[in-house]
Amino acid sequence: GLVVSSVVGMFEHVVAELTIVMCFQSLILDMAGNVGTQSLAVTIRVLMDENLTAGQKVHLVFKEARVGLSNGLILGMMSIILIGCYIYFFKSGSLQFAFAVSGCIGAALILAMLISSLVGTLIPMFFHKIHIDPAVASGPLITTVNDLVAVVTYYGLAWFFLIEILHY
């Protein structure tokens, strides 16, 4: 919690310039957490039920990454459209601003969900490799890592695209 709060504090200037991005922080964090936890559960189940070869582990990583990317693309595209319309119609922003912000949110969702699915797969594999029960050790770590990934992805994209490139 303290580490994630410190990282959010590093992006204070982004929130000060674009307060609207704060409204959608929980969307990014929650979806990244959901995807990471799902990948974690699938991976732990597979690791406990089967003796996997290196090739099967690589296949599992790519499978979970595809799932995370697919879900991210679907939710990211929906977010671009729905949040863009919401900002435009209810927050009285220009059309360009509304869809720039929603595009940033959509991109952050795609990236955060992809990275979180990879992290949710790789962390239990690491613990399994070093003979620590991944079911016990992975939970707290995956939550913190996914929150960090989501915060850095979201506010990093907001800073880079919305402030540095588009100058909002």
Per-region residue spans from a language model:
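Alpha-helical transmembrane segments and their membrane-interface boundaries
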Residues: G1-L118, L122-P134, T144, L157-Y168
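Alpha-helical transmembrane segments that form the membrane-embedded catalytic/substrate-binding core
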Residues: T143-Y154
